[in-house]
């Protein structure tokens, strides 16, 4: 297992936000909003998958993830780490290596041929599984994987997102109702704070981004997107 250092949570969040800007994983576009998978219009977009291409950044982020899990969940609370298809798979491998745990990955749907598996790798019945994704918005995709693991006999009480939107009350309710504790390193508030500090955008763009973070569904509805999220 990798030797862990337990940095201050706020420092980790700030550093991850800075690294995401440095590798150009973050994009602001208030005048031409992005369309998210949920149907929302958003002035912000983030591609955490880029982390896998920057070894020094990737290593630091995964060290932070491992230290957060051990500090907040415990050292002996998991039997394996699961990544969701597809973005979560490499991060599950990186985290499993650091925690010295086996790894599995979960398909969005059974593969439809052969043994029709949805879970790949070995997961004993009753295994305590930590699910990791690169990011989560309102928790919907993570629960696709959590539900599959539970249906196969695994136990999931914790989830890990390297980046968490942190702006939807629906997400808090979903994790609470699903009896899963979500751990995360950075949020959009951390990213916006770095953008302001480093003056990366003009004031109007930053104001629009802040307006979105304060009332995302209202902003989406005004800009051609959905004004409410699906409950499932």
Curated annotation (Swiss-Prot):
Keywords, ordered alphabetically: Glycosyltransferase, Magnesium, Pyrimidine biosynthesis, Transferase
Highest taxon, organism lineage: Bacteria
UniProt key word Ribonucleoprotein: no
Reaction(s) the record says it catalyses: orotidine 5'-phosphate + diphosphate = orotate + 5-phospho-alpha-D-ribose 1-diphosphate
UniProt keyword annotation of Glycosyltransferase present: yes
Recorded GO MF terms: magnesium ion binding; orotate phosphoribosyltransferase activity
Coiled-coil ranges (or none): none
Function: Catalyzes the transfer of a ribosyl phosphate group from 5-phosphoribose 1-diphosphate to orotate, leading to the formation of orotidine monophosphate (OMP).
Family under the similarity heading: Belongs to the purine/pyrimidine phosphoribosyltransferase family. PyrE subfamily.
Assembly, per entry: Homodimer.
Full protein name: Orotate phosphoribosyltransferase
């Amino acid at each position: 297992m990798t030797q862990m250092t337990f940095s201050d949570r706020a420092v980790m969040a700030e550093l991850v936000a800075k690294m995401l800007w440095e590798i150009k994983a973050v994009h602001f576009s208030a005048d031409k909003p992005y369309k998210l998978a949920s149907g929302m219009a958003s002035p912000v977009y983030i591609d955490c998958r880029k982390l896998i291409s920057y070894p020094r950044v990737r290593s630091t982020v995964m060290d932070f993830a491992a230290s957060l899990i051990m500090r907040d969940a415990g050292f002996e609370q998991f039997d394996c780490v699961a990544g969701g298809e597809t973005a979560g798979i490499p991060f599950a491998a990186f985290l499993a290596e650091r925690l010295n745990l086996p790894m599995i990955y979960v398909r969005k749907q059974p593969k439809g041929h052969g043994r029709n598996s949805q879970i790949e790798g070995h997961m004993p019945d009753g295994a305590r599984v930590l699910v990791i994704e690169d990011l989560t918005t309102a928790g919907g995709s993570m629960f696709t994987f959590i539900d599959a693991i539970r249906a196969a006999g695994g136990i999931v009480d914790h989830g890990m997102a390297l980046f968490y939107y942190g702006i939807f009350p629906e997400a808090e309710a979903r994790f609470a109702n699903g009896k899963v504790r979500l751990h995360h390193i950075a949020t959009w508030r951390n990213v916006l704070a770095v953008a302001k500090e480093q003056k990366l955008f003009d004031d109007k763009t930053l104001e629009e981004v802040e307006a979105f973070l304060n009332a995302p569904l209202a902003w989406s509805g005004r800009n051609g997107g959905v004004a409410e999220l699906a409950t499932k």
